[in-house]
Amino acid sequence: MSSLVSISKKLSGQRQHRERSQPEARRKYGELEKKKDYKLRAEDYQKKRDTIKKLKKSAMDKNQDEYHHHMVNSETWADGRHFDKKTEAEETETQIQKKLGSLKDLEYVKFKLNEEKKKIDEMKGELHFADSSLNGKGNTHTVFVDTDSEAKSFDPRVYFDTTTSMLSRQFNRLKNEDFQNKTIIGAGTKEQVRKADRVRRTRYNELIKRVERAKELQVVVDKLELKKQLAAGSKSELKPQKVKKAKAMRAAVYKWTYERKK
């Protein structure tokens, strides 16, 4: 296209105006600024000039006693950086609770919670679950005797008819006759024992994670149920009173005033 333009100029006798190049003596200063470069530089300068002019005007017109809500909802660090304060909901919600915070997710969360509970019950039965740390409280075995002398002379090895090494077991506790009359079937080598222990630890770790996940899903269900109840009673004149604030692993507690049904 440019060749056609140049041909048309030649035919019409129009003079070609070429841009002047940098003289050889000033070659060290680089190429001369072209018109397109000047236009970009001028537009950038004018844009910055207008922006500074607007900012100066807004600063002159600003009221010193002006109030804005963001002044209360933000803070400034020692290095001068600004940041927004977290709201109460953001401080008391985990990542999962934020993702499943809609009432539409209530039935889905209930379904996943039931699945987790079923899986936990299956794993407890499979692993002969007896870890008190996951139950939240320690297990105790109380034995009642008739007299104080029996309590003082009480020997758990005699009572349970087992050895000292078996007393700490809360399940599958072998008796003395089992050691005498039966052959205890176990692993043949130390490597098999270590392998079985690794498998057992892996299963217990999975169980611990599932218990924690079930606890968090239960909290999500509680918070969604509370949100549903608050939304249902939003048109009522008797508003519920908050008794306890919500936490990351606990829903808020509200107290409703009894409303007589018509």
Swiss-Prot record:
Predominant location category: nucleus
InterPro entries linked to this entry: SSU_processome_Utp11
Keywords: Nucleus, rRNA processing
Pfam families: Utp11 (PF03998)
Biological processes per GO annotation: rRNA processing; translation
Paired cysteines (S-S): none
Residue ranges, compositional bias (Basic and acidic residues): 19-33, 56-69
Segments of this protein annotated with the region Disordered: 1-33, 56-80
Location of the protein in the cell: Nucleus, Nucleolus
Regions of compositional bias (Polar residues) in chain numbering: 1-14
Top-level lineage group: Eukaryota
Keyword Nucleus: yes
GO cellular component, one term: small-subunit processome
Family membership: Belongs to the UTP11 family.
Role: Involved in nucleolar processing of pre-18S ribosomal RNA.
Subunit structure: Component of the ribosomal small subunit (SSU) processome.
Name this protein carries in UniProt: Probable U3 small nucleolar RNA-associated protein 11
Organism field: Caenorhabditis elegans
